[in-house]
């Protein structure tokens, strides 16, 4: 019997709706990966509603929970760590210590960092010290880095002006330590407005992928969290980087189609679960000669 992969997912949780672990854990489990959720915050709902209740997990709880898993002899079974929204820079440093602890018992374990830096215009608020931590510390530890365009620009200290510029900026991030950079959403000047574009860059190759951009009255939250989780899960299931890239784009598109059909602000993960596992659509990533 083929072994089921395990990963530790350390990011936010919302009681209502889908963001952070609430967007990523179920889809990862649905496609065959045993996700262990460790929630950095527990909020009533995501912050783009403009009001919420809840609290941030005390940073000391992260190593305590990792230690608890170690004490029952299960930490060595962890194949990867995924981190996303952080409530504080202290949480981030606790996560890096956890990654180090896991890699000590499983050197093959991967660390995917989704460097959520916030988007104040959309109501996504991240403390300034978190962005500084991500820029200065997390990128050097990550095996897989999954920024969006805003975060890519922040890492590189300038705004991308073209697709080629995005590729070069992603390559510059590889020099900090990651094996691969997945840019979840490209937003460079001159791109096709009716297309949603993504980029995957390794030391050897770069791939560009387009899918239709679906219209919503309000853009659903949690798409990036879903993207990072599915990509890491497919890698753990044996996909190559580009296979995981293509699968993720298709599965996320299926979720968005169902969400659009339901006229919902929240991702329709349960309704779309079979399409997540077996997408009906396929988008081919184009190898770039750049």
UniProtKB/Swiss-Prot annotation:
Substrate binds at residues 12, 47-48, 225. It catalyses: pyridoxal + ATP = pyridoxal 5'-phosphate + ADP + H(+). Keywords: ATP-binding, Kinase, Magnesium, Nucleotide-binding, Transferase. CDD domains: pyridoxal_pyridoxamine_kinase. Its cofactor is Mg(2+). InterPro entries: PM/HMP-P_kinase-1 (IPR013749), PyrdxlKinase (IPR004625), Pyridoxal_kinase_PdxY (IPR023685), Ribokinase-like (IPR029056). ATP binds at residues 114, 151, 184, 211-214. This is Pyridoxal kinase PdxY. The lineage of its organism: Bacteria, Pseudomonadati, Pseudomonadota, Gammaproteobacteria, Pseudomonadales. The gene is pdxY.
